[in-house]
A protein has these predicted regions:
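N-terminal recruitment modules of adaptor/scaffold proteins
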Residues: 1-60
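Short, compact, well-ordered microdomains
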Residues: 55-88
Length: 88
């Protein structure tokens, strides 16, 4: 199982975690600096190698894990996961 899937599921299912405290950063062509950051609560589903999120226009987008650069707790500043070779 991909380590990122474990982290996403932990935030979703662990009652001690609050999804409101997390953001996910990923490569998104066309966004400023090709990077997009979304609040964790926008995530709708997690698969074996991807997640889907719902944007402001209620469109669902699938993001493969290889495009994710980090998962961060905004309350504590802790980075739960970071892609190798990427500075956050």
């Amino acid at each position: 199982m991909h380590p990122l899937k474990n982290i996403l599921n932990k935030v979703i299912w662990d009652k001690r975690e609050s999804p409101d405290d997390y953001v996910i950063t990923f490569i998104h062509r066309g966004a400023a600096e090709n990077i997009k950051m979304i609040p964790f609560e926008k995530i709708r589903d997690v698969g074996s190698s991807w997640f889907t999120y719902r944007d402001e226009a209620e469109n669902e987008t699938t993001i493969p894990f290889h495009r994710v650069t980090s998962v961060k707790n905004t309350r504590s500043g802790q980075i739960l996961w970071r892609k190798r070779g990427v500075l956050v």
